[in-house]
């Protein structure tokens, strides 16, 4: 047995040391790459530095197994022979081009628009580099392909020098889609997948049993060996296992947030790290059969498509601070801004949803917590002013606790309390004597009462917004349509910005947003149910039969177990055949889809996907506040399904909220869904047909006004 295996190498003028195997010893930094600084080897904690160093140590981190006779291996070997031959005849060029196209199809997929872009922007060297990091065989899936294509586009259009200066290495591996298929067959899960994909219904409780069956599964020894090779390469650097299915992030189907991603802190002995990684892989595989993913596929007529799951395994972008690992900046960025809260903003320039720490808080809908929304055309403008800047700021941070070996959420104030986090003056403003002040130097005032994450100095003093804006412009031009991205960013000493582009996909715009919608005038006041402002997407929905109404005050007073179960009950109602056949208006307190049940109803995509209008009722006395959450996976679901989102402020006289109609109209819940009868006082189903009426909604995205009334 090898007791000590060390990789020593030089890159440029720097010498590196990386322990791959150490028998019967362990420390928290033992398996990190180290760089020689003077007479000492120092660990590389920043992800970009580590990725750059380790990627130079070997051409292919995965040790070769037995030679495969798979067709794509034959194509790869033939193309490699041509590439390494210095005297390729001119007559061979058509064959080389055909082989390159075939290898791209075998690795990346078959979508014509994507392959056209791949033909333009991927070189043979790019395809070889991808091939050298594929575990098993098969395609790498939509998420991985989209990320790699976006990087190739930026590299070509920016030029090598600018690209290298700005972009952080992504340092990724790809678990081929054939590994998923093999895992299903080997562990008697294939029939289950076919049954669920083709229409069998499953509850969230039953899905837990599906997860358990996946967790009991096993991989072939050759795949386990490659997993081990990859983990030796990463050492103790945190990694993330991300879904990358064949249909994910494709043209027309985003699958935003439908599948799972799992962080691995990657601490402990090699065997402990392997077991944690295997658990993460199995959980992501199981998410191919979760209720939201199945509902999404059915709604888009994709149930009969063979949705194979590849995986994208990436080094987590960030750096260690105390016992935690996280990026200082993360977010989502869109080349088109659907949420222009003032007419000064140019929607075509795009927008950013920015957070401190892991980007999970940028894409998930969290209670009582708000990212910074940045309109790229006017980055210093905010939707909020005055005291509301503090109220609508980020208060919690997601990060990896290396001691606990787990993903945790902490108060931002606790992380920033020491006032010594690098570049903290760029991220926070200081509350002093009731006023919010932007730091004038890197040395923060120790007498300030509170640090508030505003990112004001970051926006003014660095080139981050300009860099993101340029990236979005280049990518949207290459794609020929709006795009959305996920990223992390790091500010180096001296202010230089580096960005790690983690994801890129075509962006879905609401089909009705560009229509001219004129709100009807002279509607008798007794027929108006409510008026709404600050809307994002618009359109006209006529002949609405059902209203699913959750009373805000009764929700506020409901016990916690009832609030926790409410999402499941809404899902039952949503799945009822009569609800599916009619047009539906859903109304409830605070933020639908929030992870915090005190802030709103904790529903998932499959619980609301049959609605036409979603209304968030904001009663500040109950602590319920709507939030557009532009850029979150929840919001992208609304846009993609053309569900009109309307915030309602009953205390605003202009809202004309006819609360009496919703309280006094008879409740059809018990008759329609008898198993939900005990929720009769909290949930109301109104059938407008009972009075021979229908409900109609007009929403004008240009004036950001909407009206709902009885026809």
Predicted features by range, described:
Residues 161-169:
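An N-terminal structural lobe/cap that precedes and organizes the functional/catalytic core
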Residues 621-663:
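C-terminal regions of proteins
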Residues 2-39:
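Phosphate-binding/switch region of NTP-binding enzymes
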Residues 25-64:
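C-terminal regions of RecA-like/P-loop NTPase motor modules
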């Amino acid at each position: 047995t090898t007791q000590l295996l060390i990789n020593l190498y030089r890159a440029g003028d720097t010498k590196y040391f990386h322990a791959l195997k150490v028998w019967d010893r362990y420390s928290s930094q033992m398996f990190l790459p180290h760089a020689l600084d003077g007479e000492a080897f120092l660990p590389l904690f920043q992800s970009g530095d580590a990725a750059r160093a380790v990627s130079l140590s070997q051409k292919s981190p995965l040790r070769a197994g037995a030679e495969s006779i798979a067709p794509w291996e034959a194509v790869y070997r033939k193309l490699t022979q041509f590439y390494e031959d210095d005297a390729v005849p001119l007559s061979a060029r058509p064959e080389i081009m055909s082989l390159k196209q075939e290898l791209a199809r075998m690795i990346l997929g078959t979508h014509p628009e994507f392959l056209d872009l791949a033909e333009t922007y991927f070189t043979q060297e790019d395809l070889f580099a991808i091939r050298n990091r594929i575990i098993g065989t098969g395609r790498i899936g939509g998420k991985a392909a989209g990320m790699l294509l976006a990087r190739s586009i930026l590299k070509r259009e920016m030029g090598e020098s600018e690209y290298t200066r700005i972009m952080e290495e992504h340092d990724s591996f790809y678990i081929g889609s054939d590994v998923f298929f093999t895992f299903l067959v080997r562990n008697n899960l294939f029939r289950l997948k076919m049954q669920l994909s083709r229409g069998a219904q499953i509850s969230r409780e039953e899905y837990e049993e599906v997860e358990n069956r996946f967790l009991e599964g096993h991989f072939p020894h050759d795949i386990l060996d490659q997993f081990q090779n990859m983990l030796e390469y990463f050492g103790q650097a945190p990694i993330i296992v991300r879904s990358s299915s064949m249909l994910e992030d494709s043209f027309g189907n985003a699958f935003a947030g439908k599948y799972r991603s799992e962080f691995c802190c990657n601490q402990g002995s090699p065997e402990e790290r392997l077991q944690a990684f295997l658990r993460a892989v199995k959980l992501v595989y199981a998410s191919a059969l979760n209720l939201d993913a199945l509902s999404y596929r059915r709604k888009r007529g994709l149930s009969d498509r063979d949705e194979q799951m590849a995986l994208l395994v990436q080094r987590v972008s960030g750096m260690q601070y105390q016992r935690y690992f996280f990026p200082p900046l993360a977010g989502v960025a869109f080349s088109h801004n659907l949420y222009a809260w003032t007419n000064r903003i140019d929607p075509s320039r795009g927008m950013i949803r920015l957070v401190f720490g892991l980007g999970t808080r940028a894409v998930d809908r969290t209670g009582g917590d708000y990212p910074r929304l940045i309109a790229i055309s006017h980055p210093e403008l905010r939707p909020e002013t005055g005291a509301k800047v503090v109220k609508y700021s980020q208060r919690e941070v997601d990060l990896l606790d290396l001691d606990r070996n787990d993903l945790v959420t902490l108060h931002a104030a606790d992380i920033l309390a020491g006032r010594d986090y690098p570049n903290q003056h760029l991220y926070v403003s200081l509350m002093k004597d009731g006023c919010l002040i932007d730091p004038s130097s890197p040395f923060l005032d120790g007498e300030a009462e509170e640090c508030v994450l505003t990112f004001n100095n970051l926006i003014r003093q660095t080139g981050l917004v300009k860099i993101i804006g340029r990236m979005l412009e280049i990518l949207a031009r290459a794609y020929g349509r709006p795009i959305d991205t996920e990223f992390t960013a790091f500010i180096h000493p001296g202010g230089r910005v580096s960005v790690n582009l983690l994801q890129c996909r075509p962006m879905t715009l609401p089909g009705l947003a560009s229509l001219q919608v004129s709100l009807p005038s002279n509607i008798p006041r007794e027929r108006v149910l409510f008026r709404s402002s600050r809307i994002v997407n618009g359109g006209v929905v006529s002949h609405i039969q059902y209203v699913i109404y959750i009373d805000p005050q009764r929700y506020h007073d409901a016990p916690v177990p009832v609030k926790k179960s409410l999402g499941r009950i809404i899902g039952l109602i949503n799945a009822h055949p009569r609800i599916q056949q009619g047009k539906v208006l859903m109304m409830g307190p605070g933020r639908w889809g929030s992870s915090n049940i005190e802030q709103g109803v904790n529903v998932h995509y499959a619980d609301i996907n049959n609605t036409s209008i979603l209304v968030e009722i904001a009663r500040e006395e109950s602590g319920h506040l709507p939030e557009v959450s532009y850029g979150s996976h929840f919001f992208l679901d609304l846009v993609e399904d053309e569900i009109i989102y309307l915030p309602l402020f009953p205390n605003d006289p202009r809202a004309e909220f006819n609360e009496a109609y919703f309280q006094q109209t008879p409740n059809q819940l018990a008759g329609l869904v008898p198993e939900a009868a005990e929720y009769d006082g909290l949930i109301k189903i109104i059938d407008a047909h009972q009075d021979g009426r229908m409900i109609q909604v007009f929403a004008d995205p240009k004036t950001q006004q909407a009206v709902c009334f009885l026809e």
